[in-house]
Amino acid sequence: MSIQKIDYEFIHPELNYEAEPNFQPAIKVSVYFKKREGITSETFFHHWQTVHADLAVATEAFQHHILRYAQHHQTPEMKERARSLGEGVLDYDGCAQLWVRTWDDWMAFYSSKEYAAALSDDCNFFMQLPMTYMIGYENLIVGDASTAIGGKDGFRTQGQ
């Protein structure tokens, strides 16, 4: 593979052209969605962080295949702050972030009849379908890794 390089003197040697990426040992699945019309943002976020999270975590498919689950709540206030930057803003209200060890783990979870039975009606209650996916690897630059999955920390900056 040929990479086009520019003439650049790196401030952080951890990031130079020869440095290996710090990919975490998991696949990160980000699932973007909007709240269903007819419900308030408060209902959407509260339902998602309580009922929906509980239903998801309670499934055996989740217990056997999901390493990490986080919710990214983009509230109306945060959406307005993002718009004030004058840049584009993703038109979603939430992003569920799930980590799995392998693609087979994701497919076992995603295609589980138990998961579908537990969450299908609930999804219809509070979110618009279809959902939008982004799937890849996390390259941790700065910050702490999840030690539970054997991740490697990023490097430290002066402010840390």
Language-model features and meaning:
Residues 1-160:
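Macromolecular interaction modules
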